[in-house]
UniProtKB/Swiss-Prot annotation:
NCBIfam families: PRK08881.1. This is Small ribosomal subunit protein uS14. GO terms for cellular component: cytoplasm; small ribosomal subunit. Part of the 30S ribosomal subunit. Contacts proteins S3 and S10. It comes from Janthinobacterium sp. (strain Marseille). Gene3D superfamilies: 1.10.287.1480. Keywords: Ribonucleoprotein, Ribosomal protein, RNA-binding, rRNA-binding. Belongs to the universal ribosomal protein uS14 family. It comes from the Bacteria. GO terms for molecular function: rRNA binding; structural constituent of ribosome. GO terms for biological process: translation. Binds 16S rRNA, required for the assembly of 30S particles and may also be responsible for determining the conformation of the 16S rRNA at the A site.
Amino acid sequence: MAKLALINREQKRADLVKKYAGKRAELKAIIDDQSKSEEERYEARLKLQALPRNSAPTRQRNRCTLTGRPRGTFRKFGLGRIKLREIAMRGEIPGMTKASW
């Protein structure tokens, strides 16, 4: 189990990403727009840099929702590989069976 502080940190990052997503997209659109003046694009770049670092989606880390494990996480389920296997073996995930060939 990951430390609670790490899980809370990731939750805080997720909240910040959600909060600043619109503002960030707006500023990026101005920066990418070639028809805008160079000065206006520069101002948008400065405003983008002034946003909190943790509001960038690249700083998020996928973690298991049950254990907080940062590696081996399946995005589709939001679970780590270990917990995914345990739950699948109990038959709690519809349609998921152990592979055999």
